[in-house]
Amino acid sequence: MRGYLVAIFLSAVFLYYVLHCILWGTNVYWAAPVEMKRRNKIQPCLSKPAFASLLRFHQFHPFLCAADFRKIASLYGSDKFDLPYGMRTSAEYFRLALSKLQSCDLFDEFDNIPCKKCVVVGNGGVLKNKTLGEKIDSYDVIIRMNNGPVLGHEEEVGRRTTFRLFYPESVFSDPIHNDPNTTVILTAFKPHDLRWLLELLMGDKINTNGFWKKPALNLIYKPYQIRILDPFIIRTAAYELLHFPKVFPKNQKPKHPTTGIIAITLAFYICHEVHLAGFKYNFSDLKSPLHYYGNATMSLMNKNAYHNVTAEQLFLKDIIEKNLVINLTQD
């Protein structure tokens, strides 16, 4: 009798395995069923990307949606962390801001290119005189960040932008920088960031308290262009890629990933191949340009107390040397 039950159990296990292979395909880059059902916008590839080992979950939908953001937060643990790594004490701010947005889609409905090749364009001074504009424009997806301009720098950084990450203190306020084909992504570091977006979308007076510098007082983007980044992406960057401690000593300011590292993490979740440009800093010369635009020098980055630039540079060096990404501005 016992042998009979064991045979039934083993048969059931084998049947489950066979069905699993049929449904998901052992050679297809796996995506969680809930994500595939939710947003079938990331085309699966027949091979894993070079950086697959860095991620616990794959093809995670990076933008929050009004209809199910609480469910997704509970599923991936974002309800257990505060901003910028979760929404434990800010869920109502998220709900209100999301209710004013028109879409949480990843790509255009007509975009069916599988296995996307992406470039993440940093704002580093290393881009000066590199004439990478045409090369950058050739990628399927181009991710930029903050107020790194395209206008006037097309030869160096290209013309196209698929996604642009921003926060209230770093967003463009001059309409000449608005490309209607660009999707802009709010990276919320604090509840004030969500309140700021809500006030702009509702046409209310902007409360500028609680920001490290004066935020934009007008929004040059239309609601259809705006998305809110899932804090899970920022948490992945901090804890799994940069290995930041979850609790910093009392005598230290907590460190958070830069927008650049967050942008790379986003690319890992939506792209099959990731290239980088503009992520190299020249710390040996503090008078060298910090950005490919403007007059800021490296001395500003050296004084930054909110980011661990050393940890980020070591991470970038590691993924480049292991060929997990390709660096277009490698000297």
Curated annotation (Swiss-Prot):
InterPro entries: Glyco_trans_29, Glycosyltransferase_29, GT29-like_sf, Sialyl_trans. GO terms for cellular component: Golgi membrane. Glycans are attached at residues 129, 181, 282, 295, 308, 327. One of its GO terms (biological process) is cellular response to interleukin-6. Keywords: Glycoprotein, Glycosyltransferase, Golgi apparatus, Membrane, Signal-anchor, Transferase, Transmembrane, Transmembrane helix. Its EC number is 2.4.3.6. This is Type 2 lactosamine alpha-2,3-sialyltransferase. It comes from Pongo abelii (Sumatran orangutan).
